[in-house]
Amino acid sequence: MCSVSGVLILNPKNFEKVELKLASILKKAEDRGRDSFGIVVIQKDGTVKVRKSIGKPSEKEELLYGILDEDSRVVIANNRAEPTTEYVRQKTEDDIQPFIGDRYIVTHNGIIANDLELEKKYELKRKTKIDSAILPLLLDKTWDGNLEALKGILEQIKGSFALVIGDKKNPDRIFLAQNFKPLYMAYDHSLESLFFTSLDEYFDAKPFDPVNITKLEPYSVVMVTSNKLITTLPIMEKRKKYRVLVVASGGLDSTVAATKLLREGHEVTLIHFNYHHKAEEKEREAVRKIAEYLQIPLLEINTDLFKIIGHATLIKGGGEIVKDRKGEEGAEFAHEWVPARNLIFFSVSLAIAEAYGYDAIASGINLEEAGAYPDNEMEFIRMLNKLSPYATGPNKRIEILMPVGNLVKHEIVKLGYEIGAPLHLTWSCYEGGQKHCGKCGPCYMRKMAFRINGLKDPVEYDEE
C-alpha cells in the first residue's frame, strides 16, 4: 500500500518553496509508506528527472532537495509500504514507484488483481513483479491522453486504485483517478501550485494559510491543467431512476419521503425496524398499511439490539416519555435519544442495499428534528455519503438520500398533502396506545404542522 503524491507547478519561479512543501508531504506520508519512495519530475520539454530509494524519506532527506528547477512543471511521487504478497528482497529502481513508461508516469495506491491478465492481453512486459508497474505500459499502449478514454481503460482494472498520472507530451497537466482509494488536492495560493496526496493531513495546512483543500470524488477521473481548468468525469454513471430502500418508521417524515421518491419515478422499497420500542406495534401496523396503499414492497427487520443497549425511554421498560408543556419540551430536546439508532439502521440498510442491488437508501431525516437530534442533521447524511464508498465493496456505489432533509415539519405536511402521501395512515406518537397521546414531542409537532397549514389532522388524539 502507498501514499501517492504530486504537484502541478503553475509558477515555476516558486520551485524552491514547492520543493520544501513536497518534502514535508513525503515525510508526513511515511505512515502509509516506509519501505521505499520515489520522485519523478517532468520538465517543460518532456524530459524527466528521477530520484528513488529504499527506506524512508526522513532518512534520505538529501534526495528530497535539488531536484526541481525553473523548468520543472509536474511532479509525481510515491511512498510505498510493501505488501506481503509483493515482497522483493533485493530491490532495484525498477521495483520502486513511480513507474515510468515511454509517455506516462504513474504513481498508484491500491491493488491490481488482474495485472497478469492485462499483461497477457496487451502483450506487455514488466521489469518487476509489482502489479502497479503494468499501468504506464497499459496507458502507453491504449491511451491517447483523452480523459473520457482514460475512464474506459480504468474500467478494465480489477482491484483498487488512486492514481496520479503525468504525461511527458503534455507537461502542462496532471491526471488523477480513484475508485474508493482516497485522493486530496490542495491549491497553495502563495506558491501558485497544486498539490495532491492521499490524506489531507499531509498538507499540514493551518487555519489562516492561503490553501484550499478538496477531497476528490470517489469513482472519478480528473484532469487539471496549468491554466486552472479542472475536468471531472464519473467512472460509474448514475442512473436517472433509482432503486431506493427507504428507512420507514410509519411516521409523517419517512412516508412523505417515500411518496416523493415514488412520484419522481423511482422504484421504492420500504425497510422498517421493529426494535422493541414502545410504539412498535402501532408503527408496524402503520408501515404495512402505507406499503399496501402505495403498492410497494416492505422489508421488516426484527432486532433486540436496543433492548440490550437500553438507556432510552423510547424502548419498552425504559422509563417515561417527556410530556411537559403539552409536548413542546419533547419537541425541543432529544429526551428520547436512542444510542446510535439511525447509524445502526443506515448501516443495516446499506448492507441490504449493496447485497440486493439498490442504488440508494433514504429516510425522513429533516431540518426540524435536526434541532434536537444529531443523527437528523443534514451533515449526518453528508458524512454518511462520504463514508459509503469505503463501507461497500469495490464498484458498489450507494447514495444516501434525504428527500425532505431541508424541510421543517409543517413543510413536510404541506408537501405530503400536495403529492397525495397517505398521511391518514401514519403514526407519529412515541407511545403505543389506541390513539396518539397528544402530549409527546412528535404529537405536538404533528398537531402544529397541520394547524399551520389549515388542514385537519386525520388521526385521533387522547388529548387535543
Curated annotation (Swiss-Prot):
UniProt binding sites for Zn(2+): 429, 437, 440, 443
Gene3D superfamilies: Glutamine Phosphoribosylpyrophosphate, subunit 1, domain 1, HUPs
Pathway: Purine metabolism; 7-cyano-7-deazaguanine biosynthesis
Entries under SUPFAM superfamilies matching the protein: Adenine nucleotide alpha hydrolases-like (SSF52402), N-terminal nucleophile aminohydrolases (Ntn hydrolases) (SSF56235)
Cofactor annotation remark: Binds 1 zinc ion per subunit.
Superkingdom: Archaea
Keyword Transcription part of the UniProt annotation: no
Coiled-coil portions: none
Family according to the record: Belongs to the QueC family.
Annotated protein name in UniProt: 7-cyano-7-deazaguanine synthase
Gene source species: Saccharolobus solfataricus (strain ATCC 35092 / DSM 1617 / JCM 11322 / P2)
